[in-house]
Structure formats: C-alpha cells, structure tokens
Amino acid sequence: MLQEDKSSETMHDPSTRGVETRNVTAVDSPLETATTSESPETERTNVAPAKRDWRFWALLVSISLAGLLTALEGTITSTALPSIVNDLGGGHLYVWVVNGYLFAMTAMQPMYGQLANIFGRRWPMLGATALFVLGSGICGGATNIETLIAGRILQGIGASGTTVLTETIICDVVPLRERSKFLAIVMGMIFLGTALGPFFAGLIVQYSTWRWTFYLALPVGGAALVALFSFLKVKYQKETNLATKISTIDWAGNALFVAAISSVLIGLSWAGSVYAWSSFRVLVPLFVGIAGMGLFMVFEGSRFAPNPTVPLHLFGNRTSVGVMIMTFFHGIITIWQLYFMPVYFQGVLGSSPSRSGVQILATILAILPAAGIGGFLMTKMGRYKPIHYASWAVTLIGLGLFSLLDSGSSTGAWVGFQIVYSMGAGMLVPTLLPALLAPLSESDTALGAATWSFVRSFGMVWGTAIPAAVFNTRSDQLAPELINSPALRADIMGGKAYEHATSAFLGTLSDAASEQMKNVFSRSLRQTWLVSLAFAGMGLLAATLAREVPMRSELDTEYGMEERKPKKASEA
C-alpha cells in the first residue's frame, strides 16, 4: 500500500519553485484532516470566478483550434487510406500511414512536458504546431508511400506537442478549482476532431482528392500559428543560457522511453492483423517493450537521471495512481466505442462510410455537453470523486446497452444508447487531469500533464487492438456455424472479420449470404461490448483508490500569462 503522509512530505522540495508548505503536507490527505487555512467546505463554496480579459479568451480559441486540427488529422486517414494506397501503392507499408503518426504522437509526449519546463510553453507550442503544418504539406504533396509516411511521422511529432501543451497551458492560466470548465472546452474540441476525422475524409474523397485531407491543415494550421504567436505570451525563466537548458534534457531517459514504447506499439500494430497474437513476432516486441518501460522507470529514479522526464514522485500518492489507472481505461473505452460503433453501422446495418459518420454524431453531440456538465459540477462542488463514480457507472450502463443492438434495432435504440454512454464517458473528459494534479504542486503541472497525456494515448492504442482481437476471435468461432459457403467463411476467418465488416463487402453478397454475415458480425459485436464492460469496471474500481483532495482556487505558477505593460502617462 502506498504511504500517504511520508511520501507526500518528501515528494517535493519546499525550497524550490516557491512551493507552499500547505501543498506539501496536505497532499493526498483525507478531506477531514487536510491541513489548510480554511475548512474544505469553505474552500469549496466561497470561490469567486476570476475575471479574464479578451487575451485569455483569444488564447483559449487559439489552443482549441490547434487541438481540433491535430485530432482531426489523427483519424482522417482511416477513411481516405484505400484511395491513398490505390494512388501511391506501397503494399504492406500502408499500415505505417496510420501507425507512424500514432507512434510519434504517443512516444514523444513525456519529452514535450520536459521541454515545456525548460524552454517555457510558447516556443515548444509554436514549434510543435509548425512541425505539424510542415508534415501536413509533405503528406499532401507526397508522390510515394515513403514520403507520405515521413510526413505522417512529422505530423505525429507535432501533434504530440500540441496535445500536451494545450492541456498544460490551460493549467498554467486557470486555477485548479476552475480548470475542468476550460478543459471541457479544449478537450471537447480535441474529441470532436477525433470523431469527425473519418466523416470529413469520406466527404473529401467523394468530392475531391485525398490530398485535401492533408492540405486542409495548411490554412487552418497557418491561422492557428498566427493566433498562437499573437496571444500565447506566458512567463518562463529566461535567465538560463541555451547550452545549460539543452544539457538539462533527459536525453538517455527519453531515448530509452521512445525505444520501449515503439517496441510495444509495433507488437500491438502487428497483433491480430499481420500476425496472430500468439506469434513470437508479436510477443517478443511486446515483452521487450514492457521490460524496457520497467527499465526506464528504474533509470528515472536513479542518480543517472538528475532531471527525469517522468519523476517517480508523480506516482507517490494513491490519488495520482488511481487517476492514471482511470485515464488508461478511459482511453481504452473511448477508442473502443469510436471504432466499433461504425462496425455496427456498416457491418450490421449496411450503412455507407459517410452515413456511418453521420450516425455516430449522436456520440459527439452528447459527449460535448456531458463534458461541459462534468466541468461545471467539478468547479461548483470542488469535488471529483462523486463525478468519477457516477460517470463510470453510466458508462458501464451505456456499454451494456450496446450489446443489445442487432440488425433489427430501431434508430431510437442506437441513438439513445449512444447518448447514455456519452453522458458517462463525457463527464470524465475534463475531470481526470485536475484530479491528477490536485495532490501535486504547481511545479509538476507540465510533467504531470505530459505523463497523463501519454497514459491516455497508450490506452487508446490498446483500445484498438483488444476489441479487434475479440471481434475476430468470436467471428472465427461463429462462422462455421452460421455461414453456409466455405469460400465466404474463408473470407472472414483467420483474423480477417474486422476488415470485412463494411457495407462495400456486404454489397458483393447475395441477400441470404449478407444476412448470414450480418448475423456473425452482430453476435461478434455483442461479445466485444460485453468484454468492454470489464475494462470500464476496472476504471470504476480505480476510482475507489483516489482520495478527495481540496482543490486550489489560486494560481501559484511560474508560467502564467504575462501581465500587460501599463501605459506611460504620456500615452494615457
């Protein structure tokens, strides 16, 4: 069991970065015994919202735009990929158009947290956005698959930075108590981009060329760059020279981390699609990567890492550990639902990809207000545990309802079930990061947010691999029983069911064969949704690990917005 009092007292050095004793001694203590100057109930209720000028709102719009764009480009290739491969070729390399982006975005997130602490928030954010725009231009102009993959990797490196820094900047300029409201806006835009990517890709491919799925980022990204340059003006320590700053980067730790995570991601990308899960080509990179992650954590806690990318004290209290676990499972469930509701729409209802994109709007249109409600409640109550319990419970109900869907389900059923699920999952969106940061000092904001972003992204990777394996395995079991044609059974067996769960494939079959195939897909999806309940249940259990920590209502950070220079008397 984690030690609460001793670990929290030694977690930070109170002499550094102006950390107040209150934030150290009260870390992760029960509310009833928190050693604050006010009672917890007073802290929760007597908080007046800070007044914010137009510069704050301009900054919020700027970082929201950057987050929306990078999230949109993260999923936009899922629908456009067949057209891209048809034009550029590339054979088996096509998978790296998706995986290259995913690998770069996931593996680089902790490093961006450290860069934000060393160089401030402004230039890493501008650099990441510029890299993303450059990568988009390379992708749009690619004449072969190798160039496209290189552009996607650049996009991923840029997206990694914008994701981490968007959340970090909000934490810098908004007190902990109010953060969930504004995180609901920013992260809601990120979620919106993630969900709408395939829909926009379908429209673009249908009415134009796939290249505009990438060229679209140029004017939008350019506008985001101009806005960020104009409005992202936050404080940071400028006294240290460049050579000293570069020398403080945890080069060895970051290299070890990137290598370990890449190994895990390679294993997951091959599992169930290129090789069977039991293949040594899958198991070896998975085991090597997991061992590498363990070695990375040992290194980060050693004397060889004086300025670690992921300080171990981030995991030194049960609240932060509980929130990290919840974040991992929330990442799994989020992508699980976004990827497998379209399988139902296309593989069971027979919808086209573009119509499927419209049908899943029920999730999007419900999750955004749900995030707003979660953020409002957290700010109003100054509590997160009741929200987490309620959110996971409703998420479990929604996932369970999905298992009832079949080819005869009404529109009201699949719309209503999405709304129920989204109300639960949506309230978690803005309330996990503030809960993670509650027991930590403000000096840990960037590293904490970066680690949290990585855990969420890492969960999303598993959220595609696990349900695909469940779906394919169940289809292999059902096909001999439900499909009459041996040739048709061979089409979907051996891990190929997921890739065939499309309206295009169903359209090539006779009516009788199509009904048999829909039955296989429907029953396989039912199993997939039932398995998802286990992961959401573990998220609910993790909520019991966290403790309620009083949420600070004042900022104590070195990276807040720069004060406006007063006008001279002659100008007044």
Swiss-Prot record:
Listed GO CC annotations: plasma membrane
Span list, region Disordered: 1-46
Cell compartments where the protein resides: Membrane
Regions that span the bilayer: 56-76, 88-108, 123-143, 156-176, 185-205, 212-232, 255-275, 282-302, 321-341, 358-378, 386-406, 419-439, 451-471, 529-549
Annotated gene: pydD
PANTHER family: MAJOR FACILITATOR SUPERFAMILY, MAJOR FACILITATOR SUPERFAMILY (MFS) PROFILE DOMAIN-CONTAINING PROTEIN
Gene3D superfamilies the record matches: MFS general substrate transporter like domains, Multidrug resistance protein D
Family: Belongs to the major facilitator superfamily.
Top-level division of the source organism's lineage: Eukaryota
Protein name in UniProt: MFS-type transporter pydD
InterPro entries listed in its UniProt record: MFS, MFS_dom, MFS_trans_sf
Function noted in UniProt: MFS-type transporter; part of the gene cluster that mediates the biosynthesis of pyrrocidines, fungal natural products containing a macrocyclic para-cyclophane connected to a decahydrofluorene ring system that show potent antibiotic activities toward Gram-negative bacteria.
Membrane topology: Multi-pass membrane protein
Keywords: Glycoprotein, Membrane, Transmembrane, Transmembrane helix, Transport, Virulence
UniProt keyword annotation of Glycoprotein present: yes
Residues carrying a glycan: 23, 317
Coiled-coil annotated residue ranges, if any: none
Classification via PROSITE patterns: MFS (PS50850)
Amino acid composition bias (Low complexity), ranges on this chain: 29-39
Entry GO MF terms: transmembrane transporter activity
A Pfam family annotated for this UniProt entry: MFS_1
Lineage: Eukaryota, Fungi, Dikarya, Ascomycota, Pezizomycotina
Positions with biased composition (Basic and acidic residues): 1-15
Predominant place of localization: membrane
